[in-house]
Amino acid sequence: MSGRAVLSPQHAQASFDSGLQLYGDVPELNAVPPPSHSALMDFTRFDDFAFAYYGLPDQSSLVSLVDHTHTFQSLTTFPQHQAISGLAHSGLPFGTLPTDNYNQSMEDSKAPPDRTSPASNALEDPTTDEFGLASPNRAGGTDLGGKPKEDKADATPAWSELKTKAGKERKRLPLACIACRRKKIRCSGEKPACKQCLHSCIPCVYKVATRKAAPRTNCMAMLDKRPKRMEERAIKAISKSDQEVASSVTHPVVKQAIPGTVTSSRPTKKRGAEEAFEPDLEAWAKASSEPKIEGDDGSSSLQVQEGEENKLQHEGTEALPSREIQEHLAEVFFENIYGQSYHLLHKPSYMRKLKNGTLPPVLVLTVCAVAARFTSNPLVSSSGPEFLRGEEWASHARDICTRRYEWPNLTILTCLLILGLHEFGTCQGGRSWALGGQAIRMAFALQLHKDLEYDPSGRNGTTTQLSFIDREIRRRIMWACFLMDRFNSSGTDRPMFIREDTIQIPLPVKEKYFQFDMPAPTEMLDGRVPHPPSPNDGQIANSRENMGVAAFLIRAIALWGRIITYLSQGCKDLDPNPLWEDESHYMKHLDDVVNLEASLPLSLKHSAENLEVHKTENTASQFLFMHICLQHNILFVNRAAMSARKQHGVHDDFVSEASKRAFNAANRISELLREAEQSGCFVSAPFAGYCAFSSTTVHILGIISRNPFTKLAAQANLTTNIKYLHRMKKYWGMFHWMVENVRTQYRNVLDAMRAGANVEERATQPSFLQYGDWFNRYPRGLSDAEFMDPATHKRKDSGADGVLEAKRELRSVEEYFTLPTPRRVENKDTIRATAPKRKQSAKKQAGMPAQPGQHLDSLQSIDADAVSQERKFSGGLGLQITGAAGFNPLAASNQQSPDFSTTISPTRPANMTPFAHHAHTPTFFPPELLAMNFGQGSNGNIDPLDRQLIYGGYSMDASTGLGGGQDMMSGLGWDTVALGAQPDGRLQSRPSNAKAGMHGQSAGMADGAGLSRPEASSAWFMPFNMEPPDMDQDAGFNMGGIDPFTGVFGGGGSGLATPNALGGLILGHCRGSSTHSTR
């Protein structure tokens, strides 16, 4: 008989082997099966479990069949014993089976056969009755979950023979089956099925343990195992590459020493904590602090920064000019800006990257923005002022830089410094201050204040050694931040941020070493040498000789910063000693400025030979700028001593020596500016303009000196400085304010002279204008009205003052006379409507085309009652007239004679006076003189002797007009003069070349207005005992006209030299003076 085998790993019955052998000798069992055998043995009926059945073997040797025809009652009627239905149907007489053989087979097997298997006999089961129910032991409590009663022979379970891991006898069951554990009864532990499951006819399943239960240990053993578990967790957290390294390190077994006990001298297997962990601790301490995670280059913020840096290479490309303009403006930048304000960028590297197209667009935009003001290229030039040309490019660069303040890098830092300089030129005080502060913070974030040999921003633990050029670029960027901090913080209310002792880097090397990549050691700011070279390094050993213009310029500005801190930021009041004492801080600063100039190497001393050498190296402008700064320090220190003349206990010798040094330094600054003009080197640094302004304030005092030599030198040098300031205000807008301040100081001195007051005391009373004060003057830029039209100040409430006191609407008497009168709004339309008609009338009278800058119609239309108070402005000059109760001579003359606005040439016969023998050669006054305010009733001209010497006694009134109502003023087309034209042949004796001016510059009076007045008398005198100039005087003094003061503001709106057209006037003027003396 063959049956279907259903194999299940959970019910593999190894114990059935004995049962199969029991019936192996019975041949009848292998006969033809009954018809219902397949149906009875269908394995699908056994839902819970099934066993493999292969038929009965021969059972002749084990069982004797007495009656083959006897058929036992089928046991299939008992549903609880369906497992033996196959045997009942085959007609096997179970009652004749020998029990001894059966017991013997049970003893031979490792586990008793399953009662549901074919080898089991339900009738011989002691726990069941003839119906298959548990009758004998029904009251034993096993049906209720109690423990069954076992014989003593079966008391020893099979698992007791197993040994523990320690080799001892096992006393407890290692693992109970799931059913016994659920019923909370003792499990016999047999496999594959325990006795309880066999009796209950349920599957016996042993739960497979995923991990072995930890043995019970004491508390100290658990504490010892904790470091090992922590070490295993740490190993899982590190990368595989680090695991390979860590696997080679043996893990120490540490035995902690009990405190208070003496360690044994005998060797043990366990080491001490110091011996075991000391190498690992040292390696951990010296390891890099940056995380090393495989597959991750850094944190998310670092990834964002890298993405932004990648975008920086392309952002702003659409705003770039053409490649030709980029290269042109780059050359302009290195010619006019590099080295004078900041030593930024390496020209060979920049130009090479620019041609290859590998520069970030934001850097190119920044360079183009700051250099556009100095170019004359028609593709860049615009109709607006020069200092606003690059604003469009600067706006794009500014937007890119301000969005990346979180991720500092050298490119953005360089752009911030250059943009701060550009915003300085456009009078954006708030922007320049903010950009400078952001640049300083970014420089410290990049550790530029340290002289590092490796790039501190190295990622993934890689360190890149910096080349000499890169290290020098980093140093120069940090020094540029230092200079910007000194420039921006030179005001009264703006302290400096960077301390000198925080910068631990050497000073820049010479420019040729930097350009040609020649490493050389230099000194630090305090004179120390950080890295002295060895003889085998191949470097130049003399550190002082390796320093060029840039190094000593930084030292000069650093010293100026200390002087500013002492004089303007409260340190002067904290000095326990007065200025003239040797122990005072003032004397220390005075010694510093003298010693700094004396410490210059021979190659940097001022001489004509050194200037020629620097011209060959293209550093002549930097060389002159450095010497201007050195002289400015001397001037600044000694000017403070001049203002202390009224302090108690001051010595006269101290003040006189300080005055002498201040005048000498002011003269030296003017000489350097004149030398730069003559040698063709334009010193374009904004701070050089401030040095010229400081020198000008001293020259104004020199004009009133009783020493004739000092007076003449001051007049000539004052003209040089004013010319230079007029030129600088084209490129840097804040010099408009400085020129106005100079005009105000000049007017105060002139008023004091006329009033008979002490001029020196009055000139030194006001607080000195600081370089950083322009931030308060122009916090948010310069409007067109401030350099083209008079500014009208209208009181209005702002939202920021909403919680403050309400401002009064009325004016006091003092404010009425001192503050300007606002322009009437209702007259604006009248002014605009009448201006074109008057221009047409002027053209008809002149008979020649007139330039818009030559008309004064905007001033003629202002109401007569507001003329004496409102600040007037010369038409087309672009300058604002300031001062209390101002008086404009142009407006006064236009009111007195309506025909003064004509542009008829002063040399036409119709314009000549009948008293021709009393007239001099027509005077060509600079336009700034016409716009000057000399006080009420004064127009800057000198009246005849019959006038009284009183204040306001030199006014020009209408009664002095000439016969026939001839014009006392008439315009002149200065375009024709600048081009060398000679109107009516009267200017043939004058030089027509544009280079006839003081320093050979082109004439800049094209937008000015001429002034011609045939005098009523040839008898003139110099006011206030001023000597007439000599004929062999410098040509620059002959620009001023008949009054030595009138040459102060010569030069036209463009700031260039005025053609020397006053030679005949000076001769006639001297003649008139001699005639008056003989009269």
Curated annotation (Swiss-Prot):
Record's keyword annotation contains Cell inner membrane: no
One GO location term (cellular component): nucleus
Localization per record: Nucleus
Induction conditions: Exclusively expressed during infection of common bean.
Keywords associated with the record: Metal-binding, Nucleus, Transcription, Transcription regulation, Virulence
Gene Ontology molecular function: DNA binding; DNA-binding transcription factor activity, RNA polymerase II-specific; zinc ion binding
Domain of life the protein comes from: Eukaryota
Pfam families, per database record: Fungal_trans, Zn_clus
Chain residues forming the annotated DNA-binding region: 177-204
Annotated GO biological process: DNA-templated transcription
Alphabetical list of SMART domains matching this protein: Fungal_trans (SM00906), GAL4 (SM00066)
CDD domains, sorted: fungal_TF_MHR (cd12148), GAL4 (cd00067)
Coarse class of the protein's main subcellular location: nucleus
Additional record remark: Multiple copies of the gene are present in highly virulent fusarium oxysporum strains.
Role, per record: Zn(2)-C6 fungal-type transcription factor that has a role in the establishment of the fungus within the plant and/or the progress of the disease. Regulates the expression of virulence factors such as SIX1 and SIX6.
UniProt name for this protein: Zn(2)-C6 fungal-type transcription factor FTF1a
